[in-house]
Amino acid sequence: MDEKKVIELEGVSIYHSGESLRNSHRGELVLSEVNLSVGGGELVYLIGKVGSGKSTLLKTLYGEVPLKTGKGRIVGFDLRRLRRSRIPYLRRKIGIVFQDHQLLTDRDVFRNLHYVMKATGWRDETLIRRRIAEVLELVGLHNKEYKMPFELSGGEQQRLAIARAVVNSPAVILADEPTGNLDPAAADEIMRLFATIVAGGCSIVMS
């Protein structure tokens, strides 16, 4: 496998059992013989009907669903050998964006990002504030840092979710239907933002 690739899958079959890595038996086959190669600064769009396995593939890439068949690597982690104790280290190197945002509803925009940064090892408050300012400028929320999530539009909430995903400068972002709940104008804004992020060298795989 080419270690220069941020993601590489060869002959992968993916099973969904509804269980996490604690359960090692195979469940229902949802994808078979998948080959995927993603280099730096690439945007890859997974296309398929509802229930075709797109979300399960993304869950496999971030360690939620175990890979049991084929070869797979993401940001240097071997997915076949990924131990549960190593999943937090993997997720510090990737960004994850969900359709339903999963924001901290009791914290404002700034504190949503501050929480993630403290949880992933940032200690210097000056550096934290500087990085948050940079990221909010990137996603167009620089004048919303003290707004609560319920005060934001759907598109703004998704931009906050993207800010959270990029705050640790990941090599790749995995986005599960990030525009699924948005109106066309807001969805277009998100796609333009993704184009800007990709131009900066980060890869994005989205369904």
Question: What positions do the PLM features span?
Answer:
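Helix N-cap at the start of a conserved alpha-helix in ABC-type nucleotide-binding domains
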Residues: 184-186
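Helix-to-loop junction immediately C-terminal to a conserved catalytic motif
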Residues: 62
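ABC ATPase NBD coupling module
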Residues: 79-95, 125, 199
